[in-house]
Amino acid sequence: MIGKIKLITRDSFNKLILPVYNPAFFIPVKGKGSRLWDQKGKEYIDFSGGIAVTSLGHCHPVLNKVLRQQSKKLWHISNIFTNEPALRLADKLISSSFASRVFFANSGAEANEAAFKLARYYSSKIYNLKKNKIISFYNSFHGRTFFTVSVGGQAKYSDFFGPKPPAIMHAKFNEINSVKSIIDDNTCAVVMELIQGEGGIVPADVAFVREIRDLCYKYNALLIFDEIQTGIGRTSKLYAYEHYEVQPDILTIAKSLGSGFPISATLTTNGIASVIKPGIHGTTYGGNPLACSIAESVVNIVNTKKFLLGVEKKSKKIISELNIINKRFGLFTEIRGKGLLIGIVLRPELSEEIHNILNALFLEGVIVLTAGKNVIRLAPSLIISKRDIVEGMKRFYCALEKCL
């Protein structure tokens, strides 16, 4: 038992936790802004943001205050009742998007599960039971529930769990003819990330997204945008779909919405919501007052012109620093993404070295992520300072000098 262990170390994980993860060799114990400290007091500059989650950095003072205040009032009452923070948050999300209805949950997977169920239920009720095909894309990622992992286009995550849910097909990302070859009148939805995250930080082409929208209209299929990773300011717009001037029928968000506190949301229209009756779907913890009070504050802070312009400026600064690094090392073939979701594409021959590079960065005090086989992913706090960017890039440079 944990109580008998005098010292908690990385080895404790190997003894206690189901090995679905392979954590770093150090254990963070404290965070503030874009900095983390481990058990030994070593400081790190965090360019991972908890995988695009800590939108306002670690332990933001406003969120800490809101959490303390709400924790003294009400934690949980279940959805037998509604609550004020949930209704205030729903109103803010609706007023800043295409949507008119919101469903709250706890994770991105739950938000997507709700979206996929909603699409099938709506199509069955409005059209017929055969209209249940969902089209997704290879190299996509939509969560770890059995339904969402099957919709995601990566067999390594969905194989060996038995028969998969039927009527799920995959097309090639950014190739419209691949979609045209499988979409038909039995398609209930097309789901896509506007920037494929796990697939390597690959943005969707504007023309591709617009043609997908037209195909969905043609076949009476719903268009679902999975903005779990891109939503709430990550791309310098509140939602990434604003860059494309294309509206979805259903939108899912999570990660940055709670800046580290578990919350997600599925947004849709009154027309689609009209088929839903009490009991069709639900959640125990979704929309709880604690999560919603924090998310409301996050949206208040992020959803301003000045803040979102700041995200774009920070993105340009990071890319400028990366280009300076690349002039010295010739490490990257491409830097892609939008806002503060950045993919650094390594030369193909360096793909086998990516984990060695990550460890070198850790040792130098910089935390980054991977995305696919040869992409380093940066998804820092949206409030990361210029000082932290410059210092982080200096450490990045030093790490590469030592490992290459």
UniProtKB/Swiss-Prot annotation:
CDD domains: OAT_like (cd00610)
Cofactor binding annotation: Binds 1 pyridoxal phosphate per subunit.
EC number: 2.6.1.11, 2.6.1.17
Modification N6-(pyridoxal phosphate)lysine occurs at: K255
One GO term (biological process): L-arginine biosynthetic process
Binding, N(2)-acetyl-L-ornithine: R144, T283
Broad class of where this protein is predominantly found: cytoplasm
Cofactor: pyridoxal 5'-phosphate
Enzyme class at the top of the EC tree: transferase
GO molecular function: identical protein binding; N2-acetyl-L-ornithine:2-oxoglutarate 5-aminotransferase activity; pyridoxal phosphate binding; succinyldiaminopimelate transaminase activity
Annotated catalysed reactions: N(2)-acetyl-L-ornithine + 2-oxoglutarate = N-acetyl-L-glutamate 5-semialdehyde + L-glutamate; N-succinyl-(2S,6S)-2,6-diaminopimelate + 2-oxoglutarate = (S)-2-succinylamino-6-oxoheptanedioate + L-glutamate
UniProt KW Iron-sulfur keyword: no
GO cellular component: cytoplasm
UniProt binding sites for pyridoxal 5'-phosphate: G108, A109, F141, D226, E227, I228, Q229, T284
Pathway entry: Amino-acid biosynthesis; L-arginine biosynthesis; N(2)-acetyl-L-ornithine from L-glutamate: step 4/4; Amino-acid biosynthesis; L-lysine biosynthesis via DAP pathway; LL-2,6-diaminopimelate from (S)-tetrahydrodipicolinate (succinylase route): step 2/3
Subcellular location field: Cytoplasm
Record keywords: Amino-acid biosynthesis, Aminotransferase, Arginine biosynthesis, Cytoplasm, Lysine biosynthesis, Pyridoxal phosphate, Transferase
The UniProt record lists the keyword rRNA-binding: no
Family membership noted in the UniProt record: Belongs to the class-III pyridoxal-phosphate-dependent aminotransferase family. ArgD subfamily.
Described function: Involved in both the arginine and lysine biosynthetic pathways.
Record note on quaternary structure: Homodimer.
HAMAP family assigned: ArgD_aminotrans_3
Annotated protein name in UniProt: Acetylornithine/succinyldiaminopimelate aminotransferase
Organism this protein belongs to: Buchnera aphidicola subsp. Schizaphis graminum (strain Sg)
Lineage: Bacteria, Pseudomonadati, Pseudomonadota, Gammaproteobacteria, Enterobacterales
Gene, per the UniProt record: argD
